[in-house]
A protein has these predicted regions:
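Short acidic, Pro/Gly- and aromatic-enriched capping/linker segments at domain boundaries
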Residues: 1-7
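Short, ordered coil/turn segments that flank beta-strands lining enzyme active or ligand-binding pockets
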Residues: 9-10, 61, 70, 99
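Glycine- and acidic-residue-biased ligand/ion/polar-headgroup-sensing regions
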Residues: 53-71
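A short hydrophobic beta-strand segment most commonly corresponding to one strand
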Residues: 84-88, 98-107
Length: 107
């Protein structure tokens, strides 16, 4: 399992980095979750650059998705991977389903 952070940088671009929970104590707040959603999509989706309306944690349960950020980096997420989505401003990220997917969503 890998955890990645997608965020808007001071340069106005979105970036991706692999993170470790021990280095990000703020992720401990995720243990106090009040709401969890399950998203399952019946068709493959492709989305151009977009920011998210809120910070969220997404844990991949099934399928593969490629996320691109405006600095040109891309990352493929597989079952067990998690992403902390913090790109709530700026250009945001792209999204391309490689296979049908299901993921847990924690706002």
């Amino acid at each position: 399992m890998s955890i990645y952070r997608i965020y808007a940088g001071a340069d106005g671009e979105s970036h991706i980095e692999e993170i470790h929970v021990a280095q990000h104590p703020e992720l401990g707040a995720l243990r106090q979750v009040a709401q969890v959603g399950i998203h399952e999509f019946p068709a493959l989706r492709t989305m151009d650059f977009h920011p998210l309306p809120e910070r969220r944690l997404i844990i991949h349960v099934r399928g593969e998705v490629e996320i691109g950020v405006s600095d040109g980096s891309t990352q493929i997420f597989r079952p067990g991977d998690a992403r902390v989505m913090e790109d709530t401003s700026g250009r945001g990220h792209t999204h391309r389903d490689l296979t049908l997917q299901r993921h847990l969503y924690l706002p």
